[in-house]
Amino acid sequence: MNVAVTAVGGGVGQSIIKALQHTEYSTIGINSEVLGAGLYATRKSYIGPYANDPKYVDMMIKICRKEKCAAIFPGLDIELSPLSNNIKRFKNNDILPAVSDPTVIAICADKLKTCEFLQSNNFPSPRTFRLRDYSFELNFPITLKPQKGGHGSIGVLEVHDRREFDRYVASVDVNNYIVQECIEGDEYTCGTVTLEKRCVGTILMKRELRAGDTYKAFVVKDEKLSSFVRAIINALKPFGACNVQLRLRDNVPYIFEINARCSGTTASRALAGFNEPKIICDYVSKGITNPRFEIKEITILRYWKELAVSYDKIERMKSEGFIQNENIEL
């Protein structure tokens, strides 16, 4: 079965490619920029439009139909809404977008709505306020972060006193920022897969960050925490991969972000025995709703890897918007 993966110049798209490299599924890479590394590590690759282009959905369907892709995996948050809003169009062309419905996308794309969802379902989350309405209800330190559109640690500010607060507030859009309680403790990134409104698997990784990205991860087995994450996902009811980020304080998990997509650590999870893209592909191609997997408690050390690409191949991609690759892996 062929599978399209978008935004393969970025970490999420590349992680999906790596997770599927040694499976029966063949990936077709799509990226809007010619120098996206993933374009040169999939069997076939295409230059595609940006997600805000009116032709984006038509082009994704055209590429998927041409390559007989039964599923399409998004690699960027900005692609989630156009794919989700057009699920029916894709399905009418025998293509399943690995995305949740628009209601779930809206909750996860807005950190304030995420907190409201968690609170309404009695799950712990940091106390959170709109920046424009904030009246110093929290003790310092506090965290300022974008309400919508942020990813990784971009735009996230830890504030230690009123002087810092005033300085930072003057430099941000107060209508798109929230103030959040700082939760100290071990940070976890938790992968899940949901099929037919039921969470069918979870994986827990304690992580260390560098510049907002996971660079050391430790896979742990903790049934109590797994059950907690599963309960959140069963309440949210996404489709496919969904990533929960939390911190443990006094053994209480506080969720501060939910991403309704695969993660930059998707390939790391596959190494530990929990291959989210493969589970989803097995569902699409074989109808498997109760996947079997065995999670290994291992340490994942992430590092840069170089990919050498000839000038000729890059020029062909520029001029033709399409190339074929052989025996190249990320």
PLM ranges: what are they?
Residues 234-271:
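Conserved metal-phosphate-binding beta-hairpin within the catalytic cores
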Residues 104-184, 194-198, 223-226:
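Active-site nucleotide/adenylate-binding loops and adjacent lid/helix of ATP-dependent enzymes
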Residues 278-330:
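Peripheral (often C-terminal) accessory segments that flank ATP-dependent C-N-forming ligase machineries
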Residues 1-98:
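ATP-binding N-terminal substructure of ATP-dependent carboxylate-amine bond-forming enzymes
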Residues 159-237, 247-248, 252-254:
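Phosphate-binding site of ATP-dependent enzymes
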Residues 218-219, 263-279:
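ATP-dependent carboxylate-activation loops
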